[in-house]
Regions:
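Short N-terminal edge-element motif at the start of the domain
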Residues: 1-62
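A eukaryote-biased signal for long
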Residues: 107-219
Length: 219
């Protein structure tokens, strides 16, 4: 049985939801500790999940999301799936230092500038389930540096870590659609932040990013 969402979905740890992406693709996610969602590598073109079992090895990524994401995304509560139990949030995250400048990106031979990216990235320890104080001298967000200044030689090491940003609609939705296309975790925000070459299918993600920034600038 699937219950259709009529208003912004209230948060409850363990609640399993599906999210409709573009082109009629659905993805499964689970609410854990607010505001974190765990997204699974379970995609379908029909919003029916019979026979699916949520397992840790099928997790794409875990990310903090805004209420705006839940309000504007087409979300459905899935009641006939058992949630993943005893999930613990990741202990390694990527911290983006403030004071960044616009980054020039190129997709399909077209160059554009995107803003809002830090000038330096660090891999940090942030054990959010430990109860330890998160008392670094900069922002109070993590406990220790693992790699203070991520370089190209570190890309493979940090590839599965998530930025400590909070995701919004519709950029997160497009990221999830890219995960569907590639059949694995894809992270355009991190690829842009690291200065990696961007594949052609990031074009829509960059369109969304630059359009949102133009709208913000006009307010």
């Amino acid at each position: 049985m699937i219950e259709k969402k009529k208003r912004a979905t209230p948060w409850k740890s363990g609640k399993v939801i599906s999210i409709r992406l573009r082109n009629g693709v659905y993805v499964l996610a689970q609410m854990v500790r607010e505001p974190y969602l765990v997204f699974f590598n379970h995609f379908k073109e029909e919003n029916s999940w019979k026979g699916v079992t949520l397992k840790e090895e099928n997790i794409l990524f875990c990310k903090a999301v805004t209420r705006q994401f839940l309000r504007y995304s087409p979300v459905t509560i899935v009641k006939d799936l058992e949630p993943l139990l005893d999930y613990r949030l990741p202990k390694e995250w990527i911290y983006s230092h403030m004071g960044g400048h616009p980054i020039t990106v190129s997709v399909k031979g077209r160059e554009r500038q995107v803003a809002g990216f830090g000038q330096r990235l660090s891999l940090v320890q942030a054990d959010k389930d430990s109860g330890l104080p998160e008392d670094n001298p900069l922002m109070g967000l993590f406990q220790a540096y693992i790699l203070p200044d991520i370089q190209e030689k570190d890309w493979e090491r940090v590839g599965q870590a998530e930025l400590m940003s909070i995701e919004v609609f519709p950029t997160l939705n497009e990221r999830l659609y890219l995960c569907f296309l590639h059949g694995k975790n894809v992270n355009p925000e991190l690829d842009i932040s690291l200065g990696k070459p961007l594949p052609d299918d990031y074009e829509t993600y960059i369109d969304i990013l630059t359009n949102a920034q133009r709208q913000d600038a006009s307010i």
